[in-house]
Amino acid sequence: MFWTFKEWFWLERFWLPPTIKWSDLEDHDGLVFVKPSHLYVTIPYAFLLLIIRRVFEKFVASPLAKSFGIKETVRKVTPNTVLENFFKHSTRQPLQTDIYGLAKKCNLTERQVERWFRSRRNQERPSRLKKFQEACWRFAFYLMITVAGIAFLYDKPWLYDLWEVWNGYPKQPLLPSQYWYYILEMSFYWSLLFRLGFDVKRKDFLAHIIHHLAAISLMSFSWCANYIRSGTLVMIVHDVADIWLESAKMFSYAGWTQTCNTLFFIFSTIFFISRLIVFPFWILYCTLILPMYHLEPFFSYIFLNLQLMILQVLHLYWGYYILKMLNRCIFMKSIQDVRSDDEDYEEEEEEEEEEATKGKEMDCLKNGLRAERHLIPNGQHGH
């Protein structure tokens, strides 16, 4: 049964244009062509990237965070068995009636009970150091892969002439630069997917799962169907904006408001140009319209463009939130990351303001400076 399914799955009519056989894509005369088996290495490479990430966060990101004045903070609350049991077994957000009853039971004021629950919720928030480490790692990878992508593509004719994307398709040999560009990019997305449950959780958690799965599916499919040339263009268009986002987040956690805001505006500009202009009017035009001058519609052509359109929907989704943030900054002078961590940013800010009134000296508020001055207090995580 397995072999029957395998034979059906790899039928040429699903993957290749009519009249083309898998035998046409076998290596010959020193030319190497893509093979699905090439992608097996992306899983072990993903775990290797996780090891490299761990080393990077410890020996590069942590010292860098320290130089910015970001330290590991241990949030402690006064032990209280009654409140702790209610927090764990009932709710983390007690109603006013609950607060009144707990205050009576613990011989505390209602304000003290509210402060205890707020502090207890904040105790489980990821620290600024952890957020900085994650952003620093993503920044380093996106910078490396973008520079590598530009180096791989700058002398390729299909970067400047989209007709070259389909010249000779699908009998286009695989270049070593294309191999490593794909393998590294796919391995990175696998590593992000493996770490989603352990990294800082955000409200757009489901969107990230969809994005990573769509990215891996798209790269895997484009590899197997030998859409390598268009695939490299898709990857470079996506990576070029993320560098600025992750760097903005790093400076956000460091409390460098002016630098963070400047980088975020740069990111927003590049995002809208690359993903809402270049992607739909250049990439989708290349994959949706140009093939029809050479080929009749076939299954992989339809499936490829379906996946690209899913990505475009995600672009519009993230673009909407970016516009909301920019609108708040420009017109309301108050900005909060509407896609930030699951915990309430206002809670932590309020707690810190209370500490400040007690005379505790702070360099800046956790997760960046005050909301009315900072573009991304908890860090924006878009793709």
Swiss-Prot record:
GO molecular function terms noted in the UniProt entry: DNA binding; sphingosine N-acyltransferase activity
Cytoplasmic side of membrane: 319-383
Protein function: Ceramide synthase that catalyzes the transfer of the acyl chain from acyl-CoA to a sphingoid base, with high selectivity toward very- and ultra-long-chain fatty acyl-CoA (chain length greater than C22). N-acylates sphinganine and sphingosine bases to form dihydroceramides and ceramides in de novo synthesis and salvage pathways, respectively. It is crucial for the synthesis of ultra-long-chain ceramides in the epidermis, to maintain epidermal lipid homeostasis and terminal differentiation.
Keywords from the UniProt entry: Endoplasmic reticulum, Ichthyosis, Lipid biosynthesis, Lipid metabolism, Membrane, Phosphoprotein, Transferase, Transmembrane, Transmembrane helix
Pfam families assigned: Homeodomain (PF00046), TRAM_LAG1_CLN8 (PF03798)
Keyword Zinc: no
EC number: 2.3.1.24, 2.3.1.298, 2.3.1.297
GO BP annotations, alphabetical order: ceramide biosynthetic process; cornification; epidermis development; keratinocyte differentiation; sphingolipid biosynthetic process
Stretches with biased composition (Acidic residues): 342-355
Pathway terms, separated by semicolons: Lipid metabolism; sphingolipid metabolism
Modified sites of kind Phosphoserine: 340
Lineage of the species this protein comes from: Eukaryota, Metazoa, Chordata, Craniata, Vertebrata
Transmembrane segments: 32-52, 139-159, 174-194, 205-225, 264-284, 298-318
Localization annotation: Endoplasmic reticulum membrane
Disease listed for this protein: Ichthyosis, congenital, autosomal recessive 9: A form of autosomal recessive congenital ichthyosis, a disorder of keratinization with abnormal differentiation and desquamation of the epidermis, resulting in abnormal skin scaling over the whole body. The main skin phenotypes are lamellar ichthyosis (LI) and non-bullous congenital ichthyosiform erythroderma (NCIE), although phenotypic overlap within the same patient or among patients from the same family can occur.
Name assigned to this protein: Ceramide synthase 3
